[in-house]
Amino acid sequence: MRTSWVRGRRRIAVATAAVAALCGAGLTQGGTVHAQGKAAETPWVVSLGDSFISGEAGRWSGNSNDSAGGYSGTDRAFDQPSRTTDAHRVYGASYDNGCNRSDSAEVNSSPAPAGAHRLNLACSGATSTAILLPEHGGSPFKSEPSQAEQLQMAVTGHPVRAVVVSVGGNDLGFEDVIVACAKGFVTPIGASPCAPTQAPEVKKRLPAMRTAAVNSLADVTTAMDRAGHPAGSYRLILQSYPSPLPDGARIRYPGDKYDRLTDGGCPFFDKDLTWAHDQLVPDISTTLASAARESGAEFLDLSRAFDGREVCSTTTVQAGPSQRPTGRTSEWVRFVTTGAGQGQRQESLHPNHYGQLALGACLGLQLDRTPGDHRCTNTPGEGPRAMRLGPAPRS
């Protein structure tokens, strides 16, 4: 563990930035002056981390079980004139290695700062190991160098407004938890809620997730130092995760029945839904907020950003022949799919196109405010651009 030497790094970074830039990165003095002297250039905003910020599931505008017309207009990879489907239309070349960086990913859809250069280095499935520098255990992921390495190379010589990071969910094993809960629901014999067994296991893993986030932010700071960007010259933001599922009282398929699987794409017991929404996601958020404070980073709390917009929520509807998708009424999260005909399984329970527009709006609001910790929420009945920012709760 490296947290013992991490705590003081941000406090002394300004004083040592020149040495780190000149010696640690092997830059010449002229190179450093060049990096700081391009103030007139459009500033960069960079995203690093996992699938919740890379743009996984951005292919979908809502959910539909009707395959006609590109699943009732929800499939953004579908071209109506040619009647062809190609996920590269949404994910570009990143579809080939599975990073799935969508055109509507948070950093791309954020309205602020206006005219900024957007760079999305995040990759679906990434753990902290995919972010760390090689000397601290970082390694290539999906045939790409570690994200901290990519960051250092990309921003050297360019002004940077902000670096926003989403990390921790995969270190915690969030996907494994969801899979276990779904399997518990669909098991023909002996089906039972997962919360009683998963909750204590997740609690045990939260400290390690916190350490992973702290170490990731430390290496992002180091990479920025080496690129000629001392702490304080840019904004470092760690964000949490929105809940993809409603609590058990707000699901539009009552009774723990199989229509949650066959129609809704939310195969979970009420007890598990309530645990995930009311305890799991908030606990993750609280833990990440603590990591941000230790690292000297801002914190963007997204844990309640999708309230009322989750998969199978009573206040959303699926698209169909008589219901076109819209950000006001459709779900903002991709429903659970096997990947047979409806995109990829890995898109399940990720922010879809509307959800990503909402997260982009949250980031824009964060960057418009004075640096600090904030919570982003939506406006009931309005679209994904009508997000609101308030103070983050203190834990």
Feature roles, as predicted:
Residues 328-381:
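Histidine-centered active-site loop/cap adjacent to the catalytic His
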Residues 106-118, 209-236, 277-301:
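A structural motif corresponding to the C-terminal end of an alpha-helix
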Residues 43-60, 65-77, 170-172, 353:
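Catalytic nucleophile-elbow at a beta strand-turn-alpha helix junction centered on a G-D-S/GDSL motif
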